[in-house]
Design a protein with these regions (language model features):
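Hydrophobic faces of well-ordered beta-strands that scaffold small-molecule active sites
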Residues: 12-18, 42-44, 71-75, 100-102, ...
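Active-site-proximal loop/turn and secondary-structure-junction residues that shape catalytic pockets
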Residues: 16-20, 46-50, 77-79, 104-108, ...
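Active-site mouth loops of central-metabolism enzymes
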Residues: 8-26, 71-83, 143-158, 233-246
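Active-site pocket-lining/capping segments in soluble small-molecule metabolic enzymes
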Residues: 1, 105, 118-138, 148-152, ...
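Conserved N-terminal beta1-alpha1 strand-loop-helix module at the mouth
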Residues: 1-44
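Active-site-adjacent beta->alpha loops and helix N-cap segments on the catalytic face
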Residues: 2-4, 23-25, 50-63, 81-87, ...
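Structural motif
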Residues: 37, 66, 95, 169, ...
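Active-site cofactor/substrate anionic-group-binding motifs, chiefly glycine-
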Residues: 38-78
Length: 286
């Protein structure tokens, strides 16, 4: 992955949420299917919305070992102290996994806080700096450190400042939040001008009107233009899937000049939708 970015080739990374239990077959089958489509890496969230799922780093090891594909496990500051984090990084390096996305992590839901306590002894910037120091002193093969970039932030000037601070701490590449607005595209263009780092533009297909409403109103960090929302009204499942691919392709066409690759987020295991989007990106390269 690092070498392809260094050669200025557009990379394709696809995100899957890990399973919520030990039933792993569908996840592995979908991952193998997407590998066959020619993607460059799979990214794995670390217990999104602070709900326990299969550990992202352990799952990354399984994917890399069994499928031979590059992986980017996410690593939050929510659930581990610095000792546990260092131990996990040692394990990843031994397993030949050299990419990691550092994020502070979603807070523990209020209803769970009596039983589950967040750690948060450091944030994503400090974690990036810690890994950078280990890269320079300890690891035989350095990690490529990814960070998150919210191109939908209300105060994008402040978001850019945070991104520059992350770069100073060792972040070399960013995955952006999904882009579903003109504002998001404008901010992406500004980030491309100002940040000395690789940027992978976020694309998350919207698969229904209900899905669009939920993303617009309930998910922090995502903005959906009303013009996009209205296009999903009265669409059935098949029509919405076609529209999802159409809009994703158009977004990719608009962002391609400002990114070093694409960060595709799979909605509800709909890998058949992702396949069409991946094929579109590959045709652009041809």
């Amino acid at each position: 992955l690092r070498k392809k970015l260094q050669r200025k080739e557009k990379v394709i990374c696809v995100e899957f949420d890990p399973p919520m239990d030990c039933r792993i077959e569908r996840f592995m089958n979908d991952a193998e299917y997407l590998k066959e489509q020619g993607i460059d890496a799979i990214t794995i969230a670390d217990c999104p919305i602070a709900r326990a799922r299969v550990d992202s780093s352990l799952l990354a090891c399984k994917l890399h070992r069994e499928l031979g594909i590059d992986v980017i496990p996410h690593m939050t500051c929510r659930d581990r102290n610095i000792n546990a984090t260092k131990a996990l990084l040692f394990g990843l390096n031994i397993e030949d996994i050299y990419n990691v996305l550092v994020v502070t992590g979603d807070p523990i839901p209020a209803a769970d806080r009596q039983e589950v306590k967040g750690v948060f002894s450091f944030n994503s910037q400090l974690l990036a700096g810690y890994i950078r120091d280990l890269n320079e002193t300890t690891f035989p093969h350095p990690f490529l450190i990814f960070g998150a970039l919210n191109v939908n932030a209300a105060n994008f000037k402040q978001e850019l400042l945070k991104a520059k601070q992350k770069i100073q701490q060792g972040v070399q590449a960013f995955l952006t939040q999904p882009i579903h607005s003109a504002k998001g595209l404008q901010n992406l263009q500004q980030a491309h001008r100002e940040l000395d780092a690789w940027i992978l533009g976020g694309v998350m297909p919207i698969v229904s009107y209900r899905n669009a409403l939920y993303m617009k109103n309930e998910i922090a960090g995502i903005e959906v233009d009303d013009a996009i929302l209205s296009r999903y009204e009265h669409k059935n499942r098949e029509e919405a899937a076609v529209l999802a691919v159409t809009i994703a392709k158009a977004t990719i066409d608009e962002m391609v000049s400002f990114v070093d690759g694409f960060y595709l987020i799979t909605p509800f295991h709909r890998v058949e939708i992702m396949q069409q989007i991946i094929a579109h990106i590959q045709q652009m390269d041809d």
